Every structure is written in C-alpha cells, then in structure tokens.
Design a protein with these regions (language model features):
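Basic, glycine/lysine-rich polyanion-binding surfaces/domains
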Residues: 1-169
Length: 169
C-alpha cells in the first residue's frame, strides 16, 4: 500500500504470452482492490482461473524457471489443467516447510498490512530496488538504505523438545 505495508504475497508466473498471479484465495479481493485503479490505465483485466498449481523443489541448477533459491535448492511453480495427476508429489505441509526453510514467509489474511517488505525477507528476492516502482516505494527504500533492521523473519530448525530456560530470562 502507499505506506509501504505488504498487503498480499503472490508469485507472478509467465506461461506463453500470459501472466498469471499465484495468490491465496483469501487475498484475491485485497489484491484486485489495490491494483484495479492502475489496471484501467494499461487495459489490464483480472480473471480468476482454476488451474492446478504444481510446486517443484529442485537441486540448484536443475530448473530453468525458479522463483526462489538458496545455495542448494530452487523452488519452481507450474500451472496444469485440473485433470493433471502428479505422480511424484509431496503434500502441502511439506511444500510449506520447504518454503520456510528457504526463508519464505507466506502471509495469512490477518497478516495483511502488518509488515513492510524488509521485515519478512521480501527485500531478498521479491522486491527489486533496481527497477520499476510500486506503491510505498519511497518508504521501503528509505528503510532499506537509511534504516536499521529492527525486525526480521528468521527460520530455526530445532529438535522437537522443550529447552530448559534459566530463571533470569
């Protein structure tokens, strides 16, 4: 939004000559509401599609078109027809865990408008400071170049047990 808050998270996917926005159903109205005022200037329309979204986790270098990566893995998305059957799959919980391990936070509807991109790692690969412009860019850029990181989304992998915390904490 104009204050630099993240309203929704999504992935832009280009297949052939069409662009698709991969977004949770809860965010569709928020997303279109924020962008409809700009869409009319470019003769752009938003249509809801009912494709299957297939996510892939590949070793680094094995994917042509990935949306996020680290030193070892790449995450990739594809759109398929509804009757597509995937034979080599993981469940949604495993996919979400892979995203969290890579430091990707997927927002819930209740998170809309609570965070700026730098607070949830969107400055790493989701917000470009080199090109384009977006609503709230001045605030976000000022935080990036002049501010101090006060909050950051971090992923910790721990064993499933409780630690004994000393009383002085």
């Amino acid at each position: 939004d104009h204050k630099g808050q993240v309203m929704a998270d999504f992935v832009v996917l280009k297949e052939d000559n069409e662009f698709f926005i991969i977004i949770q159903k809860d965010f569709i109205s928020i997303f279109t509401g924020e962008l409809e005022i700009f869409a009319k200037f470019g003769s752009v329309s938003f249509d809801v599609c009912d494709h299957k979204i297939i996510g892939e986790i590949n070793k680094k270098g094995d994917s042509d078109n990935f949306y996020y990566s680290n030193d070892e893995f790449e995450l990739n998305l594809h759109l398929k027809k509804l009757n597509y059957k995937n034979k080599n799959s993981i469940n949604l919980d495993m996919w979400n865990a892979a995203n969290k391990i890579l430091g990707i936070l997927h927002l819930n509807k209740s998170d809309s408008g609570k965070f700026r991109p730098l607070e949830i790692n969107f400055d790493k690969q989701r917000v470009s400071f080199e090109k384009g412009c977006f609503r709230g860019q001045e605030i976000v850029a000022r935080m990036k170049y002049l501010g101090i990181d006060r909050r950051k989304f971090c992923t910790f992998i721990v064993q499933n047990f409780l630690l004994s915390i000393p009383k002085y904490f």
